Amino acid sequence: MLKIYLIFLTFFILAILAIVVIAFLKIKNAKFPYMKKECLLSEAERKFYFVLFEILGNNYLIFSKVRMADLFYLPKMNNSDFYHYQNKIQSKHVDFLICDKENIKPLLAIELDDSSHLKIDRISRDNLVDKIFENAKLPIFRIKVSASYNKENLLNQIRAFAI
């Protein structure tokens, strides 16, 4: 009886090992359809980034496409509430984040608003984002996409947020 048990156990372990090896080989040899983007930012975002860098670059750090889930944390709460609130920010990001150069403290979020921000669903999303930033006491500055930006005016608008 013990001999049959050991034979069965050996075959069982070999079967599990074979499954693991096959799964590993499938993953190792898998082809994924992902392609590298030519640029992280859209043309409008890139133009705005370089203007921001020109007026702020020596004094602040400028990050792009920062996930809100990396900006904000939730205090201790029950799991249901945690997932409810976490899901609201999980896949959202802000276009730019201005941070203190010394300690990388977030100072100001910037949203570059194009025509898509006029759509009903986008307005609702923007209102939610604005409310989250307000409650977290992190200012958010919305600016319309433009072919060009007056650097002095833009700097004054940003300074109005006390950075």
Feature locations, PLM:
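N-terminal signal-anchor transmembrane alpha helix of single-pass membrane proteins
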Residues: M1-N29
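Active-site metal-binding core of divalent-cation-utilizing nuclease and nuclease-like domains
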Residues: S64-L107
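Short low-complexity, flexible loop/linker segments enriched in glycine and/or proline
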Residues: M77, L155-A160
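Basic, amphipathic alpha-helical patches used to engage nucleic acids or provide basic targeting signals
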Residues: V94, K101-L155
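Surface-exposed alpha-helical segments enriched in charged/polar residues
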Residues: F50-E54, K131, R159
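Surface-exposed cleft-lining segments at the edges of enzyme active sites
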Residues: K31-C39
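Acidic-basic catalytic patches of nuclease active cores, encompassing PD-(D/E)XK
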Residues: L40-F82
